[in-house]
Amino acid sequence: MNLYNTQCPVPKEQQPVHEYTSLKNSWFFCWPTLSRRSYNKKITIALLLNCLLVSPILLSIFPITKLPLKFFFSEFITSSLMTGFILIRLYLGWSYVVKRLMSATVFYEESGWYDGQIWVKPSEILLKDRFIGLYEVFPLLNKIKNTLSFLSLMISGPVLLFFYF
């Protein structure tokens, strides 16, 4: 029996567990839930697609025949920054959900007229939500943070070399 259905006045689409499952099942936000190999593959594909997107613009700024190193460094930096923005969006989505899961209260709107109300979770629902937050969502947030850290380390070298050459 679902505890939310019997005890919760919050509309289903605003319930933290429903928000968690909808993120987990969405095309974009499910990336961190994939295996490490599949997740890295998606991030690498995003990085390569970003390289393809920025290449025409950067070719007009840095002609590859005259400034090949500047072109390659700027392409890597720009595409990495765009991939970083994708990772930040992933992080923000999951951090919103974990905040709602870990909170003892849930803010919700019934009619959409900005008449928001606060519902205090009963202890069994709070325990279940915190369990999901701690053991399901926090590892995903750590995976995204580690990827962002690795990406920022990868950018630092080309940034220094860009200004050197």
Curated annotation (Swiss-Prot):
Which domain of life does this protein belong to? Answer: Eukaryota
Instruction: Return the InterPro entries for the record.
Output: CGLD27-like
- Kindly state which keywords UniProt assigns to this record, in alphabetical order: Chloroplast, Plastid
Pfam families cross-referenced by the UniProt entry: CGLD27-like (PF06799)
Q: Where in the cell is it found?
A: Plastid, Chloroplast
- So what family is this one in? Belongs to the ycf36 family.
**Would you tell me the protein name for this molecule?**
Uncharacterized protein ycf36
User: What gene is behind this protein?
Assistant: ycf36
Annotated Gene Ontology cellular components are:
chloroplast
**From what organism does this protein derive?**
Pyropia yezoensis (Susabi-nori)
